[in-house]
Swiss-Prot record:
This is Putative NADH dehydrogenase/NAD(P)H nitroreductase XCV0587. Keywords: Flavoprotein, FMN, NAD, NADP, Oxidoreductase. It is an enzyme of class 1 (oxidoreductase). Its EC number is 1.-.-.-. The keyword NADP applies. It holds the Pfam family Nitroreductase. GO terms for molecular function: oxidoreductase activity. The keyword Oxidoreductase applies. Belongs to the nitroreductase family. HadB/RutE subfamily. It comes from Xanthomonas euvesicatoria pv. vesicatoria (strain 85-10). InterPro entries: Nitroreductase, Nitroreductase-like, Nitroreductase_HadB/RutE, RutE-like. Its cofactor is FMN.
């Protein structure tokens, strides 16, 4: 493995990064969003399954489709954000495994009823959603992840007739510090972790 990141990089990714509630009126180009995915795709997932699917909602039409699914507290900031990413997962992800994991017959591990794949799709898709947040920060973007929305409405509007299910949303852009809440505390190591 390479050397540790310097303190400034760790600050940008973790210590001084904040969950944004407001963004500057600066668009995020499709090129930057493609660059973002090119980083996210390298994050590890079980059997290299990569079940996450991302919809980058940037247009007025896309935001109008999303609006009915948003909770009241999340609607205004989401509609104003330059980008809202629907982080979803494909419950038929195993169909891509002969290409993604050629070392073994990994597809056969997940053959059978879709319900048997749901847990793996959700778990590994969630990992990829976390990679998206960190990759966005690495590229100088700010992120505002949230789960205050109606999954069924999002699925009907964006994924009807597919095995893709929404997980959570992430607003992306260049953050406006005026929209930040005071920094909340975090659990200490001894509260959240232990050695065995």
């Amino acid at each position: 493995m390479s050397d540790s990141l310097n303190a400034a990089a760790l600050d940008q990714l973790f210590r001084t990064a904040r969950t944004q509630n407001a963004f500057a009126d600066t668009p995020v180009s499709h090129e930057v969003l493609r660059e973002l995915y090119e980083l996210v795709k390298w994050g590890p997932t079980a059997a290299n399954s990569g079940p996450a699917r991302f919809v980058f909602v940037t247009s007025a039409e896309g935001k109008a489709k999303l609006k009915p699914a948003l909770s009241e507290g999340n609607a205004a900031k989401t509609l104003a954000a330059p980008v809202t990413v629907i982080v979803a997962h494909d419950e038929d992800f195993h169909e891509k495994l002969p290409y993604l994991f050629p070392h073994a017959d990994a597809k056969s591990w997940f053959d059978g009823p879709r319900e048997g794949r749901t847990e793996s799709a959700f778990r590994n898709g969630s990992l990829q959603g976390a990679y998206l947040i960190l990759a966005a920060r690495a590229l100088g973007l700010d992120a505002g992840p949230m789960s205050g929305f109606d999954n069924a409405k999002v699925d009907a509007a964006f994924f009807a007739g597919t095995p893709i299910k929404s997980n959570f949303l992430v607003n992306l852009g260049y953050g406006d510090p005026a929209g930040l809440f005071p920094r909340s505390p975090r659990l200490s190591f001894d509260e959240a972790a232990r050695f065995e």
